[in-house]
Design a protein with these regions (language model features):
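Alpha-carbonic anhydrase
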Residues: 2-28, 32-257
Length: 257
C-alpha cells in the first residue's frame, strides 16, 4: 500500500494534480491503436530519475493470491511459419495465466483484475539508461476493458522461491500448457510499492495505446541461475526497443513515502 507521509509545496502539488488528471483522462478513454491522432504514446520508454515529476499519486492496493494455480503458456508470433517451433521471436514469451477473480489491484477507486503475468529479457524499460536482466509485466483490466500494467525489474541476487517454481515449468514453443499450483504471486513484488507512472501502450502487437503503466521503483532479486534459466529460452532477447517519450510526463512518488 502507498501512503503519503511528506508534504509538497503548493506549486508542486498543483503540478502533480494536473499531471495526474491528464494521465487519468487518457486512461479513461476508449482503447485506441498506435495510429490514433497526435504524437504516439508507445511503450517501453527510458526513465530517468531526475526527469520525473514528483507527485502524491493514488495509492496502490494490491490483492494478489498467495496460493494460486497458474497456467504456463508459450505465446507465439510465428504459428503460421513452417519452422516457427524452432525460431524465437522478439514478441514471444512465456505467460502465466490466472483464473478470473484470482487477483486484483485497486488504484484511484478503480479495481483492475489480474489477468496474466509474463517476462521479457533484457528489461524493456530502462532506468537511467540501464537495463536489468529481466522485467516482469503484471497485466490487469478493469470492468470497462481498460488496461493497467505493473512492471517489476529483476536483478541478480538472492534466490526467489516463487520464481524458481515457475521457471521449473517454463514451457517450450509448440508444447502444451502446464499447470502449476501453490504459487505465491504476491512474493513476486517488492515490499515497497513506490513507482514511476505514465501513459503508454502494449509492447507487443497491436501496440494498443492508453495503457496505464506503473513501474515499481524497487527491483526484486533472482539468482543468476534463475535468470539464466529464462534467458536460455530467448538467447537474443524478447524485448521491444525503447520508444520516444514525446509529450508525456513520468510521475513518481519515489522519495515521498
Amino acid at each position: 500500500m502507498l501512503r503519503t507521509t511528506v508534504g509538497l509545496n503548493r506549486r508542486a502539488l498543483l503540478q502533480g494534480a494536473a499531471a495526474i488528471a491528464g494521465l487519468t483522462a487518457l486512461s479513461s478513454s476508449a482503447a485506441a491503436s498506435a495510429t490514433s491522432s497526435g504524437p504516439p504514446h508507445q511503450s517501453p520508454i527510458g526513465i530517468y530519475r531526475g526527469g520525473t515529476q514528483q507527485a502524491h499519486l493514488p495509492a496502490l492496493h494490491v490483492h494478489y493470491p498467495h496460493d494460486a494455480t497458474v497456467t504456463m503458456k508459450y505465446i507465439r508470433e510465428d504459428a503460421d511459419e513452417p519452422d516457427g517451433c524452432t525460431v524465437r521471436g522478439d514478441e514471444e514469451t512465456v505467460r502465466a495465466e490466472l483464473p478470473p477473480g484470482t487477483g486484483s489491484l485497486e488504484m484511484g477507486g478503480v479495481t483492475y483484475g489480474l489477468v496474466q503475468f509474463h517476462w521479457h529479457t533484457p528489461s524493456e524499460h530502462l532506468l537511467s539508461a540501464r537495463d536489468y536482466p529481466i522485467e516482469m509485466h503484471f497485466v490487469h483490466q478493469d470492468a470497462s476493458g481498460h488496461t493497467l500494467v505493473v512492471g517489476v525489474w529483476v536483478r541478480p541476487g538472492r534466490t526467489n522461491a516463487t520464481l524458481g517454481s515457475l521457471y521449473n515449468h517454463l514451457v517450450s514453443e509448440c508444447s502444451t500448457a502446464d499447470h502449476v499450483g501453490h504459487i505465491d504471486v504476491g512474493a513476486l513484488l517488492p515490499r515497497r510499492h513506490t513507482s514511476y507512472r505514465y501513459d503508454g501502450s502494449l509492447t507487443t502487437a497491436p501496440y494498443t495505446e492508453h495503457v496505464q503503466w506503473v513501474m515499481l521503483t524497487d527491483p526484486i532479486t533472482a539468482s543468476p541461475r534463475q535468470i539464466d534459466r529464462f534467458r536460455t529460452m530467448f538467447p537474443t532477447g524478447n524485448r521491444r526497443d525503447v520508444q520516444d517519450i514525446n509529450d508525456r510526463v513520468v510521475l513518481s512518488d519515489r522519495g515521498l513515502l
